[in-house]
Design a protein with these regions (language model features):
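C-terminal luminal/periplasmic domains and tails of membrane-associated envelope-modifying transferases
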Residues: 8-179
Length: 179
């Protein structure tokens, strides 16, 4: 690289990927720090009770998965529902590495996008960088909708943040720019 320091817009983009919630966010305890890995989700895609959604991903850091956070979750019918997660290695899809569940009560939400929903595993799940995993998302409600944060660019300058960097595509399912 010809640069002596990191370019500020690239560092700002990296900061956003670590701190601005997408639809699905992995919290990986790595060494002395937590690495937050956002995962893309199709905008407006309903997860139905009889059709679990399988989300394939590859961790960008070695460490222990302690929790998964949905940026915004809501049940389309606005009824209380249970949401269950199952994590498996892609090489052994029938062997669950961990399970977690959480209750979603859409009746208490003022935000039309829904509310954050946190899933904590009973035990931390070791993840290996560059190994493939599958996260299965299931609901017993009408239709589960997940959404990431909405990013607003208040400028006509054509270099709005965040940039595509480190394998992340901010508008490819991580964030919305339609709200």
């Amino acid at each position: 690289s010809i640069y002596l320091r990191s370019e500020t817009r690239m560092e700002a983009s990296r900061w956003m990927f670590q701190n601005v919630p997408s639809a699905v966010n992995l919290s990986i305890e790595a060494d002395d720090a937590t690495y937050n890995q956002p995962l893309p989700m199709p905008q407006g895609f309903p997860i139905l009770p009889d059709a679990p959604y399988n989300l394939a991903f590859v961790p960008k850091a070695d460490g222990n998965l302690t929790e998964i956070i949905f940026g915004y979750a809501r049940d389309e019918a606005g009824i209380p529902a249970s949401v269950e997660l199952t994590l498996a290695s892609a090489s052994q899809p029938d062997l669950a590495l961990g399970r977690a569940s959480s209750a979603l009560d859409s009746t208490l939400m003022a935000d039309p996008r829904g509310a954050p929903l946190t899933f904590a595993f009973d035990e931390a799940i070791p993840l290996s960088k560059d190994q493939s995993y599958t996260l299965t998302i299931e609901t017993n409600g009408a239709a589960l909708l997940l959404q990431g944060s909405a990013i607003v660019n208040e400028t006509d300058y054509d270099w709005g943040l965040p940039f595509r960097i480190d394998g992340y595509d901010p508008y490819g399912g991580l964030y919305s720019n339609e709200d």
